[in-house]
Regions:
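Asp-based, Mg2+/Mn2+-dependent phosphohydrolase catalytic module
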Residues: 4, 8-53, 59-79, 88-112, ...
Length: 311
């Protein structure tokens, strides 16, 4: 877990020219490459906030102390919100239960996982596909079964229509080898649920995520996924945009990773908000190119900016 001093953005003295960036507007605990006027105009347009979860509103099983206040702020401003996660290890129902346990009530419509996005992608692009070989947890596999798919076994004669590789905390060596076998068959579409190398955790361990599993498969059979569904692919935000009848610039994507959360927003034409409560450090944020539209200490500091913009 990355720890930050309470006033990191305002008290840390950094020579931005070291990073060859244009000077950034500094407002309390926020930073932006935009002027304050343009920043507030962009925030004033926001009608919906898509929230990453791990590293953004909680870490592992611990809710950040400011999360409730931030969500209350959105409600008071009339801004709707949803939860997006690249972590496919749990079904969307499991995530709703976890949020409820943490004191956050959310509906089915507010939860969108990379598993659900993968299901939507397969239905759209491979409507005849029914049989899948998946690297994924039992909870994720149930999500696909409920959607009408059949999961193939670890048998070379049980040929799938599509290979789906996900973050799998129940991974066995045999199934990794079988997934690699199917990936070596170029006529079988190969889909990855998300690009993350590791999953954030508050435990003393590194959780190897989907991107790392795909790299292992690539090392063995020289094939990469045909498509990676989760963030930074903009499809998840496009679905939210279309379902809610919004324009892309009326949505903010808020998360702790530049290469997934912020990149998703930029790819979708939405406002990209980086929070420093998870994976990304201030130094990494300053060195990134392009810059996040907003870099905030945490979601509550972003909420204060929204209040200012909507007042």
């Amino acid at each position: 877990m990355v720890m930050h001093a309470p006033m990191l953005l305002t008290t840390t003295k950094i020579n931005l020219t070291t990073y060859k960036l244009a000077p950034m507007e500094k407002i309390d605990n926020w930073m932006s490459p935009m002027s304050e006027e343009k920043l507030l105009q962009a925030c004033a347009r926001i009608k919906h906030v898509a929230l990453d979860m791990d590293g953004t509103i909680y870490m592992g099983s611990t809710l950040f102390p400011y999360t409730h206040h931030f969500l209350d702020t959105l409600t008071q401003l009339g801004i709707t919100y949803s939860f997006l996660t690249n972590n496919p290890t749990k079904s969307h129902k499991d995530y709703l239960i976890k949020l409820e346990r943490l004191g956050i009530h959310a509906t089915d419509e507010q939860m969108y996982t990379s598993s659900l996005a993968t299901i939507d992608y397969i239905r759209l692009h491979y409507p005849q596909a029914k049989r899948l070989f998946t690297l994924g947890t039992p909870s994720m596999q149930q999500e696909f079964i409920k959607a009408g798919f059949e999961l193939t076994t670890d048998d070379p004669n049980d040929r799938p229509d599509i290979l789906v590789v996900a973050f799998d905390t129940t991974l066995t060596y045999n199934r990794l080898c079988r997934a690699t076998w199917w990936a070596s068959k170029l006529d079988i579409p190969y889909i990855a649920t998300n690009p993350d190398w590791v999953c954030p955790t508050d435990q003393d361990v590194i959780l190897v995520d989907c991107g790392s599993l795909c790299k292992a498969i690539e090392g063995a059979c020289k094939r990469t996924p045909d498509i990676v569904i989760g963030k930074p692919n903009p499809n998840m935000l496009y679905c939210i945009r279309d379902m809610r009848g919004l324009d892309s610039n009326e949505i903010a994507m808020c998360g702790d990773r530049i290469y997934t959360d912020v990149a998703t927003a930029q790819n979708a034409g939405s406002l990209g908000v980086l929070v420093l409560s998870g994976e990304t450090t201030l130094e990494t944020a300053l060195a990134s190119n392009p810059q996040p539209d907003i870099t905030a200490l945490n979601v509550d500091e972003f909420g204060k900016l929204l209040v200012k913009a909507h007042s």
